[in-house]
């Protein structure tokens, strides 16, 4: 995106919303609390419940204000007084989700608050009808082209108001939402940026803007207001963009300046650790959060993902039952129950609960991705592809959906499609070894072996989660008859798994020892060959080969065959694996500069 397309000049707009000063200074927490309490009330009056809740939770984390410092409610304008009866009635209808009825009684109102509720009621009415049609007529996996029919009319009306500079911060927010829904992304970004300047304390505008930012470069070109709210926005967008180190630093700074009791910040830190697969840390933080806020449901689906990965059935069962008691019809609750059934390998039931979650909120990203995983388990690749595609429609930054699509096309033996989707996943998670190993396998199938080498080595260099990159790289060197490089990879693999004490599948370990035994035997390095052959005897699939090789080594030694001192060996075996401490010749480490990205 060009810089000029994202930088907007903000002109004054007519507004009945009180001026809300919001500098970037955190030194006056009392003033920040006043601002949060005020914006919580203003958003609540307009039916923006999530923004109101966010502001109220953040305000609650700060020290209480004395009576003398509590702000009076905003003054009522002449227009507000004229529309008071209609607004009061319409807001009651709005609160019980009778949106058309609310809009009917607000038609013709002139105050900014009543006008926003009128337009917002029309928008939500269209969204509700669209969702009803999606669920009832087509089902959650056949969303098709169902649209909110009210969007175009709303855009025309809001555009006229915008050109006349008659939209306040809330009106700009709604205009941006309408533009985003119509896929007018560039225009939506400009309007949301304008909304943050006009009303910087409205979290909803920041959040909508966050959903449209695709990379860090795009973020640099935004002309954002210099406000303390910007710090919360940056922490959130860094988490979304997988810039976890920067995100954690931002959240730590916010804790240091006085928001240490904020459950929102604590939950975001847990999500950040989840994103970098620091499972122990994330679990610990979520458990602490549950103690502080036992009835919290937000982010509990992420908590359940961690319990799922660790196969903690009893803890996941307890969480599912607990959330059912709190609110069984929340999206997060359905996802937690789905994860519970998935862990028990009841994939049909799991998919059913993810579908229930999508009936409650068709734009809930986690449910689409998890349902795709379940269809993969059920070998229903076409349904899995649809689910993953819906997840990408909701959020193009979801690497799990791109990775899932790569896996489905790998099953369908379509390597070029597979390569495309794995590349997209890798772009979003450049330091995730799983994406790199998947890319390497794709390149290998396409006979692009140099690229495959790069991917496997890079996967090892960034921290191989599954401990498979070196094995795959070694097998690739075997295939290319690069015996010394293959041996070095196998030795490094063995050193790694023995140094961390991790239990691995026997097939991988035995494969490494079998190759090394044969390699050292060819090099006439009897001690090393004997040590590896003895290790082969510990595994069923290599036991006979190991015994045969030991007999050959013994026979050659009895015949007086001397070990070689000229043929190079990769480097020493770990001391615990060597038959003795007899030194062997060591060559320079493997030169991987030619295959390192």
Curated annotation (Swiss-Prot):
CC annotations in GO: anaphase-promoting complex
InterPro entries with a match to the protein in the record: APC8 (IPR007192), TPR-like_helical_dom_sf (IPR011990), TPR_rpt (IPR019734)
Entry keyword annotation includes Transit peptide: no
First and last residues of every TPR repeat: 27-63, 73-112, 114-144, 169-200, 229-259, 263-293, 297-327, 331-361, 366-395, 400-432, 433-466, 468-500, 504-540
PTM description: Phosphorylated. Phosphorylation on Thr-562 occurs specifically during mitosis.
Gene3D superfamilies xrefs: Tetratricopeptide repeat domain (1.25.40.10)
Any one biological process term the GO annotation gives: cell division
SUPFAM superfamilies in UniProt: TPR-like
N-acetylalanine PTM sites in chain numbering: 2
Pathway entry: Protein modification; protein ubiquitination
Modified residues (Phosphotyrosine): 273
Phosphoserine modification, residue list: 578, 588, 593
Modified positions (N6-acetyllysine) in chain numbering: 467
Crosslinked positions (Glycyl lysine isopeptide (Lys-Gly) (interchain with G-Cter in SUMO2)): 147
Quaternary structure note: The mammalian APC/C is composed at least of 14 distinct subunits ANAPC1, ANAPC2, CDC27/APC3, ANAPC4, ANAPC5, CDC16/APC6, ANAPC7, CDC23/APC8, ANAPC10, ANAPC11, CDC26/APC12, ANAPC13, ANAPC15 and ANAPC16 that assemble into a complex of at least 19 chains with a combined molecular mass of around 1.2 MDa; APC/C interacts with FZR1 and FBXO5. Interacts with FBXO43; the interaction is direct.
Role: Component of the anaphase promoting complex/cyclosome (APC/C), a cell cycle-regulated E3 ubiquitin ligase that controls progression through mitosis and the G1 phase of the cell cycle. The APC/C complex acts by mediating ubiquitination and subsequent degradation of target proteins: it mainly mediates the formation of 'Lys-11'-linked polyubiquitin chains and, to a lower extent, the formation of 'Lys-48'- and 'Lys-63'-linked polyubiquitin chains. The APC/C complex catalyzes assembly of branched 'Lys-11'-/'Lys-48'-linked branched ubiquitin chains on target proteins.
Protein family according to the UniProt entry: Belongs to the APC8/CDC23 family.
Protein name: Cell division cycle protein 23 homolog
Gene source species: Bos taurus
Encoding gene, per UniProt annotation: CDC23
